[in-house]
Swiss-Prot record:
<comment type="function">
    <text>The major functional amyloid subunit in this bacterium. Intrinsically disordered in its monomeric state. Upon overexpression of the endogenous six-gene locus (fapA-fapF) in situ, cells form large clumps during liquid growth, make large amounts of biofilm and produce amyloid fibrils. Expression of the 6 gene operon in E.coli strain BL21(DE3) induces flocculation and biofilm formation with copious extracellular fibrils.</text>
</comment>
<comment type="subunit">
    <text>The major component of purified amyloid fibrils. Forms fibrils in vitro; in the presence of FapA the fibrils are about 50% wider. Interacts with FapA. Fibrillates in vitro; this is inhibited by FapA. Fibrils are resistant to boiling in 2% (weight/vol) SDS and require &gt;90% (vol/vol) formic acid to dissolve.</text>
</comment>
<feature type="region of interest" description="Linker 1">
    <location>
        <begin position="96"/>
        <end position="126"/>
    </location>
</feature>
<comment type="similarity">
    <text>Belongs to the FapB/FapC family.</text>
</comment>
<keyword id="KW-0034">Amyloid</keyword>
<keyword id="KW-0964">Secreted</keyword>
<feature type="repeat" description="FapC_R1">
    <location>
        <begin position="62"/>
        <end position="95"/>
    </location>
</feature>
<dbReference type="GO" id="GO:0007155">
    <property type="term" value="P:cell adhesion"/>
</dbReference>
<keyword id="KW-0677">Repeat</keyword>
<keyword id="KW-0281">Fimbrium</keyword>
<feature type="signal peptide">
    <location>
        <begin position="1"/>
        <end position="24"/>
    </location>
</feature>
<feature type="short sequence motif" description="Cys-X-X-Cys">
    <location>
        <begin position="237"/>
        <end position="240"/>
    </location>
</feature>
<protein>
    <recommendedName>
        <fullName>Functional amyloid subunit FapC</fullName>
    </recommendedName>
</protein>
<dbReference type="GO" id="GO:0009289">
    <property type="term" value="C:pilus"/>
</dbReference>
<feature type="repeat" description="FapC_R3">
    <location>
        <begin position="200"/>
        <end position="233"/>
    </location>
</feature>
<keyword id="KW-0732">Signal</keyword>
<keyword id="KW-0130">Cell adhesion</keyword>
């Protein structure tokens, strides 16, 4: 077969395809990919209120500890360890992802913790908070709070958004309020020859070693402490198919 004869079937097929396209109606013609118009969102809203309470820890021993925990872990880890009275603990995460099918993508974590008009009495109380050999060799976002005592507030927040869209936002808002609380810390000598004093011990030992990513660790002993670990990440393109884009992170 001559080369000219071998090309004839291909030429005929291309000509036929072009003829069909020429006869197609307006609705059947090729159209560009439409710009993203939707919205993808992940939101966490959380409220914790401790109000008008009375806590009496007389000669009480409060021990809060994390020993050999959260090591060799990956991803998002939130741990709260508390011992005592009137403590508030919370972990919140808002994660969203979109592959170019939305114009606006955002993740929001909005947290409110309130401790108000409470009465805390510590007489001869011992509070020990210890983080020992924990969160080692971990990667990702790790938030650890350890508290011993009364009226402590603990919080771990995470807001992450990844998208191909033109508008990307990640926001995390944490509000911790301690208002009009009464704390009484004094030695206790009742039924004892020697007074027993209030003791607060907070320790961090051999923890968070060889870890990568965002690591937040809080250790507190006593009364009325407020602890928070927050991470916000926003990742998107600056020039997308939908037009000029933007990245926002709060």
């Amino acid at each position: 077969m001559k080369p000219t004869m071998a090309l004839k079937p291909l030429v005929f097929a291309l000509a036929a395809l072009m003829a069909v396209a020429a006869q197609a109606g307006p609705a059947e013609k090729w159209k560009p990919t439409p710009a993203p118009t939707g919205t993808v969102a992940a939101a966490v809203t959380d409220t914790q209120v401790s109000k008008d309470n009375k806590f009496d820890d007389t000669k009480t021993l409060n021990n809060a500890g994390a020993n050999g925990s959260l090591s060799n872990s990956k991803g998002n880890l939130g741990a709260n360890i508390a011992a005592g009275s009137g403590n508030q603990q919370d972990n919140a995460a808002a994660i969203t992802s979109s592959a170019g099918d939305a114009a606006t993508v955002f993740a929001v974590a909005d947290i409110y913790q309130e401790s108000k008009d409470n009465k805390f009495t510590n007489k001869g109380t011992q509070n020990n908070a210890l983080l020992n050999n924990s969160a080692n060799n971990s990667s990702g976002n790790v938030g650890v709070n350890v508290a011993a005592g009364q009226g402590n507030q603990q919080k771990n927040n995470l807001a992450i958004v990844t998208a191909d869209g033109k508008n990307v936002a990640a926001a995390s808002n944490t509000e911790q309020v301690s208002l009009d609380n009464h704390f009484l810390n004094e030695a206790s000598s009742k039924h004892s020859y020697k007074p027993q004093y209030v003791v607060n011990n907070a320790g961090l030992l051999n923890s968070a070693n060889n870890a990568s990513g965002n690591i937040g660790v809080n250790v507190a002993a006593g009364a009325g402490n407020q602890q928070s670990n927050t991470l916000t990440l926003g990742s998107g393109c600056t020039v997308c198919a939908a037009g000029t884009g933007s990245k926002l992170a709060f």
